[in-house]
Each structure stands twice: as structure tokens, then as C-alpha cells.
Amino acid sequence: LADSNITKSALASALKELMETTPFAKITVSDICAKCNMNRKSFYYHFRDKFDLVNWIFDVEYLNHVQIGKNLIGWDSVLHLCNYFYENKDFYRKAMKVEDQNSFINHFRELVSPLMAEDIREILGEQTDADFYVNFFCDAVICAFGRWISQKEPIPPQKFVELLKSCIQVVVLTQERMNS
């Protein structure tokens, strides 16, 4: 297992280094392997494709860190995630632009959607339209994250989270006005 993690980490480092100068779409598995002196067979033993490697980077660097160290909920978890993206903005700025079948955006959606679904179903109950709301808010959050991190100089994470909170408050206030 230790050798496996060393190999995966070497491939991840190679991809990150390549992404500093090369658009993701132009990076091949051969490029990644050449960068860390491995063969393609080693790559494919561990990953399906380069998208799988990007997702593994997020899972190991962020998700495993959260599961091991912090038990964050609510806005604290959003801020923690934003801090991670901000610290790694050069990498995720490029990763979030890719919209292929196995892209990071899709992986991120798979992680965010169940969390949002839980909150939305708690608020709405088991309405038949709950899936619509989950998809709507997932799209909004993922788009907001992508737009934020893609800026040349993204606003600090704390400010971004404050703006997200404000957006939700505006939605709630608008709904209250419409119902009165």
C-alpha cells in the first residue's frame, strides 16, 4: 500500500507540475509518465485516465484531510473547502474548466449533491420536486466556485463565503416577499 501511494503521489505531482505550463486538454498520460519516469502500465494500474488522477488528488488532499482531522459542518465546512481551493487555485482553476465525462466538475458534483440533497429534503420534506431544487442549487454552487476560483485574483475565501451566505439570504427574503 505504501508503494502504491508513493506511485500515485509521484503521478499526481507530475500532473500538477505539467498543469502549471500546459492546458489540461493537451496533457497526455504519456506526458505525465515521462515527467515522473514511470511507464503507462503503472499509470493505468492505479488510474482509469488523467481525470481519475485529478479526482484522486482532491480526494486525498482534501477529503481524507477533512475525514481525519476536522469534523466540520455547515458554513465552517464551506469555508474550509474554499480555503483549500484558494491555496490550490492554480491547479483547480484549470481542473474546473474541464467538462468531460469523468471531469473534476462531475466528481465535485457527485460529492456536493448528496450533502445538498440532505439539507434540501430536511427543509422541503419529501416533495416530488426536491430533485429539481438539489440540481438547481448544485449547479449554482459549482458555477459559483468555478467562477470564483477562475478569476485572476479571486477574492479571499472568507469574503466569498460571506457572499454565498448573502445570496441564500436574498433567495429567502425574495421568497418571503413573494408569499406576503
What are these regions (language model features)?
Residues 147-180:
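C-terminal peripheral helix-coil segments that are non-catalytic and often amphipathic
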Residues 8-16, 20, 25-29, 34-37, ...:
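An amphipathic alpha-helix adjacent to DNA-recognition modules
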Residues 80, 100-124, 128-143, 169, ...:
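Amphipathic alpha-helical packing segments from all-alpha helical-bundle domains
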Residues 15, 19, 57, 61, ...:
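Hydrophobic recognition helices of helix-based DNA-binding modules
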Residues 3-10, 129:
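N-terminal positioning helix adjacent to the helix-turn-helix/winged-helix DNA-binding module
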Residues 4, 32-52, 84-87, 91-95, ...:
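Basic/polar phosphate-binding segments, predominantly the helix-turn-helix DNA-binding elements
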Residues 74, 97, 101, 126-130, ...:
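Residue-level recognition of alpha-helical structural elements
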Residues 69, 92-95, 120, 148, ...:
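Secondary-structure edge/capping motif, primarily at the C-terminal ends of alpha-helices
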